[in-house]
């Protein structure tokens, strides 16, 4: 089980990402136009003024059950440990143990 503060920190990041998504997208949209170097620097400064945790690349995928960040399967939203347990208990429909 992940520490509770790590899970809460991740929730806070997700809120910031959603809050600043449109603003960040607008600023980046103006950056793509043909601008002078000085104008590009000003736009970069605007981006840097936004909170650091509002950028999507700082988001970390976490298991919804345990909060574990490593060994994460996107399709299920679970870590490998929980995925294995749930699949053995037939709690995930359509998932079965491989045999070849």
From Swiss-Prot:
Part of the 30S ribosomal subunit. It comes from the Eukaryota. Pfam families: Ribosomal_S14. It comes from Gracilaria tenuistipitata var. liui (Red alga). Belongs to the universal ribosomal protein uS14 family. The gene is rps14. GO terms for biological process: translation. One of its GO terms (cellular component) is small ribosomal subunit. One of its GO terms (molecular function) is structural constituent of ribosome. Its main location: plastid. Gene3D superfamilies: 1.10.287.1480. SUPFAM superfamilies: Glucocorticoid receptor-like (DNA-binding domain) (SSF57716). It is found in: Plastid, Chloroplast. HAMAP family: Ribosomal_uS14_1. Binds 16S rRNA, required for the assembly of 30S particles. Keywords: Chloroplast, Plastid, Ribonucleoprotein, Ribosomal protein, RNA-binding, rRNA-binding. This is Small ribosomal subunit protein uS14c.
